[in-house]
């Protein structure tokens, strides 16, 4: 059984491109579009990738979109992903010219904490402390 990681994405790019991704997220979430592979969940990240015509090949796509919001030219996606960040961000950046996908991932079980936002543009904290006090 997988350890589930929370991954938050902040996606910058052309407004038309961001709107396209957002529209697909909402269409799958509202069951307005059928899933792209037999047995797939409507919130599987791969639906977006395949609907965009991207060849996923051997890409690691074990994530499920929990929320998707587009506001002020920024697309915000929250996902649950198995073990850590998936290839979702890489596939989007390769598909769209000028797109930048910032992410932060937290998976407590295997202590996976990572980000590519080194300047803190969207994810300002650089440290995460998990502590447990015996008896509490």
Residue ranges with predicted function:
Residues 25, 39-136:
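Charged interaction segments
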Residues 1-30:
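Short, extreme N-terminal segment that most often corresponds to the first beta-strand
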Residues 35:
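Pyridoxal 5′-phosphate
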